[in-house]
């Protein structure tokens, strides 16, 4: 029988020290009640007794997938009482469907539920162990992943933007954990789905890994070492990509977005083209794309005709090409909603800062300023109604303050490099029926505030989270 040659609370302490956690932070344990999380919960209860400077919480997620799920809740609540640790039970609904992985969807729902109970300073602890790491490496190989995927799981990782995830048992084998539970007579649940090898991890755990271990007993340890080396190499790549990528990114002249300069990208080697595009996608908050998807996307972006307005959808990401630049946005299946004209009621006081909410888009910030070197619109006359509109006819003539002569609106959009899909989202300020300002771009020459004269400045103050649903 395997000896439980580890001290759980000591591993927790070592893990927490490496993370440099602030006093008062909450240590949140993902607690299923299985043998792995049971051992970690028992160790956390011992650690908590000597470390009152932290707060503690066990979180059990009820997935609703097993007829035994209610009994598991009862077990976890009883154990939490014995451990003298607070527990929160969260019930979730797991998406199911012919093209959905129950494993992946359950994991996604579980992490979403747990993170909803965490603040940015809090830390998540999970009971992943050495054999889980081997499974993750094998699955990465099956999927054809590179160094990033083969890095598998780290003992310390950042997730959900700014939260830390710790895996104190990552170098402990399943056999050691089971021996530990037996030595402490710890009760734990057995999830009946763990014996169903139609799930990839179960297939590896039940059919493949035992054979690998019978031939190479240390394979879990050596696979973990390879994962650590891949993580080390990936960190170097990530650092270099982070250093180079800003040279290829441009701020768009509207909103708060960016675009990738394809002309500059085309002068890089194929390997760097792929690394930089992947880095741009992931740094923009989108899920990693496969190697095949990346190669196809690169080919389409870099070989399209100069005047081509390419549009490619990958999962929930929409990639558009316009004037040698690539733009990323979230894909929404619904037809864009129309942005209606809104009449603005400006405050009567001359000196004010006012924000007018534009549903579905943003807030328009209106400032009354004396001469500050910027371009301003003269104050409206009593008989002039002020309104904000969208999608004015392209034949409308405008004379921007920074142009020698007037041109049709559709020509000005081209001159200013505004992509076609953004033109209907630019707020246009009207005095009665006269366009006086394209917010973020220009002030109409004949409505420009004179030097040393008080005027209005319009700007986009806040881009709402609903912006992409338009």
Swiss-Prot record:
It catalyses: cytidine(34) in tRNA(Ile2) + L-lysine + ATP = lysidine(34) in tRNA(Ile2) + AMP + diphosphate + H(+). Coiled coil: none annotated. Keywords: ATP-binding, Cytoplasm, Ligase, Nucleotide-binding, tRNA processing. CDD domains: TilS_N (cd01992). GO terms for biological process: tRNA modification. Its EC number is 6.3.4.19. Ligates lysine onto the cytidine present at position 34 of the AUA codon-specific tRNA(Ile) that contains the anticodon CAU, in an ATP-dependent manner. Cytidine is converted to lysidine, thus changing the amino acid specificity of the tRNA from methionine to isoleucine. Belongs to the tRNA(Ile)-lysidine synthase family. PANTHER family: TRNA(ILE)-LYSIDINE SYNTHASE-RELATED. HAMAP family: tRNA_Ile_lys_synt (MF_01161). This is tRNA(Ile)-lysidine synthase.
